[in-house]
């Protein structure tokens, strides 16, 4: 779907997801749904937190290397968040 394509194009170069991408420059997201927090503990890993993280991670954790996603529509970021919430081992 659209979320998987966005992940592949925009996230998979840095992030690994088992069976999807092999990025190794940023955290492995294969088990993201099982983690209590995002950004090394700076925000809760729940539906709202994940959407905030995808939309505004630069403000939440200053100096983070992950690029901004201003060019990705909010609806698509929401779909990406929904997909990421399913990732568990």
Could you describe each region identified by the protein language model?
Residues 1-8:
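Electrostatic cytochrome c docking/interface patches
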Residues 13, 19-88:
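Extracytoplasmic electron-transfer domains, predominantly the class I c-type cytochrome c fold
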């Amino acid at each position: 779907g659209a979320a998987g394509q966005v992940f592949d194009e925009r996230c998979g170069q840095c992030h690994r997801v088992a069976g999807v991408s092999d990025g190794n420059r940023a955290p492995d997201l294969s088990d993201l749904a099982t983690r209590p927090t995002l950004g090394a503990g700076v925000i809760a890993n729940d539906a709202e937190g994940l959407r905030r993280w995808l939309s505004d991670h630069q403000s939440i954790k200053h100096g983070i290397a992950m690029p901004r996603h201003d060019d990705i529509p909010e609806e698509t970021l929401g779909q990406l968040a929904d997909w990421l919430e399913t990732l568990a081992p």
